[in-house]
Amino acid sequence: AFSSWG
């Protein structure tokens, strides 16, 4: 799984 916040 991959999550990103920016």
UniProtKB/Swiss-Prot annotation:
Keyword vocabulary terms for this entry: Amidation, Neuropeptide, Secreted
Purpose of the protein: Myotropic peptide. May be important in the stimulation of ion transport and inhibition of diuretic activity in Malpighian tubules.
GO cellular component labels: extracellular region
Name of this protein: Locustakinin-1
An example Gene Ontology biological process: neuropeptide signaling pathway
Record organism: Locusta migratoria (Migratory locust)
Subcellular location: Secreted
Major location category of this protein: secreted
Modified residues annotated as Glycine amide in this record: 6
